[in-house]
UniProtKB/Swiss-Prot annotation:
This is Uncharacterized protein 088R. GO terms for molecular function: ATP binding. The lineage of its organism: Viruses, Varidnaviria, Bamfordvirae, Nucleocytoviricota, Megaviricetes. ATP binds at residues 41-48. Belongs to the IIV-6 075L family. Keywords: ATP-binding, Nucleotide-binding. InterPro entries: P-loop_NTPase. It comes from Invertebrate iridescent virus 3 (IIV-3).
Amino acid sequence: MIELQDETTIKIKPLDLDMINPNPANFMDPNQGGSKIFIIGKSGSGKSTLIRSLFYNKSQIIPVAQAMSGTESETGFYRQFIPSAYIFDEYDSQALGNMIMRQKAARQYLANPWTMLIIDDCMDETSVFNKTPQPALFKNGRHWKMLYLVALQYALDVKPGIRSNIDGVFIFRESNVAIRKRLYDNYAGIIPTFQLFEKIMDEITKDYTALYIHNVTTSNDWRDCVFYYKAPFENQHVDQFKFGCCEYRGYGAKILKPHLK
């Protein structure tokens, strides 16, 4: 619990990752929808540690994943836990389309059809969100048994049609006032004022901790929508885990291009 001393004391609660669907209690429910989550933070802010923590948290209930990363060829980050066959070094709309077709079929025929999709540092322009298949992902993705993560280095101005379909946003430290204002306007407007948002940012986003805005709630109290989360920095289980079911990893090894083996 973090307490913010203002005119009144505001208590910010820690985030339970089970609040992000699916979770162990609902992933086998055929009517359970997925989530669209934004992760916004500069290089070195703690974003990668958070992403690994999310994959680890969901690895017992989600059997497959796909990653698109603009920095993968340099860092090899996703190859540490996702088979290389399912990783793309750039944004690939055709691969996304194929994955959507897979999800539509999986939903009909598989007991556990869930997948994770992350697009990391590949969407520098807001125009990408207007191109196929992005509008469908945000509008209908919750019906495709998908946890969709978008990781950005800075805040993009997104259209209301996209913004209203984002289920949650992780926000890491940011000192630039203009960028903070963009973060507030696009993703954190549930907090009553920009001044209060800045105070919360200053207090929470220290030491690689993220502010989390939870958009999936029935409460009218903004304090029920604001949390903080700090991923475990050095955890042997998280650092060494491998994502995916045996069939997923085995098939990935079979189809892997020779120069990537």
